[in-house]
Amino acid sequence: MVRRTSAGWLFLMLRAYRNWDFPKGVVNPGEEPLAAARREVREETLIDNLQFTWGEEYRETEPYSHNKVARYYLGETRTECVSLPVSPELGRPEHNESRWMDLAGVLAVASPRVAPIVRWAAEKIGIPDKPA
């Protein structure tokens, strides 16, 4: 998820323990993947005004942690303030922190699994790739 500011594009990163990632989650039975992406963003951040300015193209990670594959869409929002609501299943927020970051900041904290997704998103929105 990205947000355009007067200083340029920012990416929303969420931290769970020491790991930074984008909003993500499980596709429920009968749910379309893009609808699941919208729902997960809303559940994890309360942001409900996503626009898919660059279409429904997505990127997936390489398999990780028990062969999971995360699918990421590039959504845009104008929302600056992010809330981390309590998950009914966990009894606490799913994430410890949220932060809007520029490309260099994201690449500095992104795991090797997430970094290719960041670079793809940066290319889609027209940010030149910068080494971390």
Each predicted region: which residue ranges?
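Short, well-ordered beta-strand micro-motif
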Residues: 1-3, 74-76, 102
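Residues that flank catalytic or metal-binding motifs in active/ligand-binding sites
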Residues: 16-18, 69-71, 94
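Glycine-centered loop/turn positions within well-structured domains
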Residues: 18-20, 43, 80
